[in-house]
Structures are given as structure tokens and as C-alpha cells.
């Protein structure tokens, strides 16, 4: 299997930069892995169990899930990406080109669902953090009434309509994990 597009800033020294400055040039290459045991250590079932059961509010659940990089802590989400790493998984901008990206994100969604289901009524209305990744640039806090542009797949959808995977509260999603 091969991928192309990206990397804009390759993390592996022998991966050539994209031939176009905008990163959209044709540059096929084979998938590669660079397994990182340190990252894998924070993705174990014990770590994930603690994530789900030891974080009572959304702010800390999200912070623990994502990781606190300034403190040298990787979370389950970042740990999953860096466990596989390599090319393209280690390139932030093109990592969705790696099939493992989708398996990893299905698990992240499932962990969110398990955490949310513990106090479903309250957590369907719980929003934390700001509108930008790592609050860069600084931005206001998110709300249930914020619009999420899903592009051609779904148009504009309010955050409140994405809070339940069960289609409740007028939601757009309709699935359950067994």
C-alpha cells in the first residue's frame, strides 16, 4: 500500500519533503512504522480504565486523554498516534492517510462514549476548553451552540447535535458500541 500528499514537515530524516511548497504535490511512498514503546505505555487497558473512571469532569477527561505535553505527559490519544508513528502516521497533516488512524480514532470515540455513559444526562450538555487546539491562538470557550462545519459530509451542525451517538436530543449521529 502506498500513500501520497504531505509531509509538509517530515519527522523522519529520510522522508523527502513534498515537491510542492503547498504540500499538495504528487509524492507516492510506502507506509512505514516506527513503533514507540514509551508512547504505547500510555495506551494500555489499565491507563484507559483510569482515564474513564478517575476523571469526573470533562476538562480533566479531555486533558488526560490528549496529554499534557508541557509536563511531558502523553495521553491515550497522542500515545496512539506516536505508538505507530512513522510515515504517514507521524505527520500531523496527513496521518488520516494511514489506515491505522481510523482504527485509533474509533477507539478514542469509544472511550469518550464509555466515559460519557457513566453520567449520560449531565455529560450530554458538558463542554470544556476553547475553540482552538491547545488554545493557540487564544480563543473563547466552546459552547453547545457553536457551529461545526462538516463540509460535504454533513454541512453545518451544532455541537449540541453531536453530543450523543444515540441520536437523542435531536442529534445527527446514530450508533452504539457493544
Placement of each model-derived feature along the sequence:
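C-terminal accessory segments of proteins
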Residues: 1-178
